[in-house]
């Protein structure tokens, strides 16, 4: 998801999405270890989404506007 799309969500919604993505990342890592994950690039995309959400939340915390 793009950062501009994520800006529209509230902090609570972003925190919920962050929790869901962390769970998804954990599941993907387990699948990778068990050799059941066929598309390993999914891990990269989930990690990037987590970073985007954390960046937006931190920016709001500091009062940074873009």
UniProtKB/Swiss-Prot annotation:
InterPro entries: Ribosomal_protein_uL29, Ribosomal_uL29, Ribosomal_uL29_CS, Ribosomal_uL29_sf
Any single GO BP term: translation
Family of this protein: Belongs to the universal ribosomal protein uL29 family.
Stored NCBIfam families: L29
The gene coding this protein: rpmC
Protein's UniProt keywords contain Ribosomal protein: yes
GO cellular component term of the entry, any: cytosolic large ribosomal subunit
MF annotations from Gene Ontology: structural constituent of ribosome
Keyword Cell inner membrane attributed: no
Keywords: Ribonucleoprotein, Ribosomal protein
PROSITE patterns, alphabetized: RIBOSOMAL_L29
Record's protein name: Large ribosomal subunit protein uL29
